């Protein structure tokens, strides 16, 4: 395979002055979008008696509850030690019923679970 350059001629120079290239611009304004005419004046309604506006009453009641800025709420936090996060654990009876009564036993298993704090060891049903 020959390693010849693909381009035999040099590219044209880029120092063309304005209006000398192939795409010279025509007269100024040629091809420009014409400006839009001014909009027509609004029609005025002339009536002898002004129409009364309906009365609008707006009654707003807003209840604002402010919480202290320093409180941090932990969902699932232990109410005894306030440090640990409660974990779900299944009772022996719940696991036994899940095995014996297979499809419906899972309902018993989830109904008989305990929540336990790993920090203080407190259990909640």
UniProtKB/Swiss-Prot annotation:
Topology relative to the membrane, per the entry? Multi-pass membrane protein
Please verify whether the record's keywords include Translocase: no
Please list the coiled coil stretches: none
Which GO MF terms does the UniProt record name?
identical protein binding
Please classify the protein's predominant subcellular localization into one broad category: membrane
Sequence intervals crossing the membrane: 67-86, 92-112
Keywords annotated in UniProt: Cytoplasm, Lysosome, Membrane, Transmembrane, Transmembrane helix
Q: Where in the cell is it found?
A: Lysosome membrane; Cytoplasm, Perinuclear region
Oligomeric form and interacting partners: Interacts with BRI3BP. Interacts with MGAT1 and IFITM3.
Entry's family note: Belongs to the BRI3 family.
User: What name goes with this protein?
Assistant: Membrane protein BRI3
Q: What is the lineage of its organism?
A: Eukaryota, Metazoa, Chordata, Craniata, Vertebrata
Q: Which gene encodes it?
A: I3
